[in-house]
Amino acid sequence: MRNILVIEDSPLVLKILEHLFRQEPDLEPIFCASLAEAEVMLDTSSDLFFAAIVDLHLPDAPNGESVDLVMRYHLPCIVLSGSYNEQRRDELLMKGVVDYVLKESQHSYEYAFRLLHRLDHNSHIKILIADDSDAQRHYIRHILEPHHYQIIEARDGKETLRQLNEHPDLDLLVLDHSMPGVSGFELVKLLRQKLRLNDLIIIGVSADPKGSLSAQFIKHGADDFLRKPFCPEELNCRVMSTLERRDLLRALKKAAEYDALTGLRNRRAFYEQGMQILQQAQRDSRHISVAMLDLDHFKQINDGFGHASGDSALVVFARALSSFFPDMLLGRLGGEEFALLTLHGADHVNQALEKLRQHCAGLHYAVGAPPLSFSAGLYHGEPEDLESLLHEADIRLYRAKQQGRARTVLA
């Protein structure tokens, strides 16, 4: 839960904000209607707050004193204003507020909440600023720091590559076109040969007046482009939109590859990843182990205790499976059927399956339900096509069920 300080006196604006907060269970607003109230609140409880939404003009703070108050406590500050003043906006942004939002429409207030959500995520976001100009790097850092990003700097192409190697988890690169040693184009081409589009966001920047430069940057693999000089809001909007787009693509990819109930790979993703493991085994002349697992008497669990209990059994089993086989390829192929693929030997896998079986017997998944058990078929052999390997494991799974369930058949 994140506590948000809201300093606002307008009944209409408060009504809108209260409505939006009701849709955000992770955000808890604490309202103050005046500068005096806010001073008391921050003086006694400033450590409770994650960020603040602040009206620029209050009856007892007509000149933005409420913003200055919040900034003194180093809280991320989103400013609301009923009128637009470009000079005032620039002053506030250079002072370090998160953003300056006009009270224009529902969309404006929703944008303020997007900022709150990004602030909550941004502490995990790493951004590399690559520019040979000290002044330009400091300017970009000053713009981005109020949003709680982790900022790293590089002054030339060589240092940029070094920072990328030292920080493989970098999320975004702000890259100047004209740097000593290697151009922005060359760096983008080099990085895209190693990294997929969703692994690193690249925003090119340049003071070059050529109109084709932005298109060339994007054709080389950049995600976006900014022409210098740019205003703080433009950079922040580009950074936020590219990060949100990446998050959406990752969520779509996860939904396409992972089973929504258990969190394991689905059949398609299991096959795709399995083919890569097979190719590795073929290159290294290694054998491969594959197992098919099936929950015992699953239909009886569904019929006798309800489908919610059946779902609970699947989730509990999937968690246990992931815990006992953390470095192996796992998947839910459908219903109560699971699969496992690894380069480990059959004895290693068989021993782990027996430990998993003992562990599952003590797991609780529904009141009054029988102990959780599973049957497994395990095959170890040459890395032929995946379908044949799974078929061999499935034959052994069938034998395990014929022999009374709750066992693994290998031979």
Listing of model-derived features with the role each one plays in the protein:
Residues 34, 61-65, 156, 183-187:
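Acidic catalytic/metal-coordinating carboxylates
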Residues 53-55, 175-176, 206:
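Active-site residues of response regulator receiver
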Residues 253-272, 293-307, 315:
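Conserved nucleotide-binding and Mg2+-coordinating catalytic segments in signaling enzymes
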Residues 253-254, 267-287, 318-325:
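Short regulatory alpha-helical coupling segments
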Residues 329-332:
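A short pre-motif secondary-structure segment
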Residues 341-349, 374-392, 396:
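Catalytic strand-loop-helix junctions within cyclic-nucleotide turnover domains
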Residues 392-411:
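Catalytic/regulatory signature loops of cyclic-dinucleotide turnover enzymes
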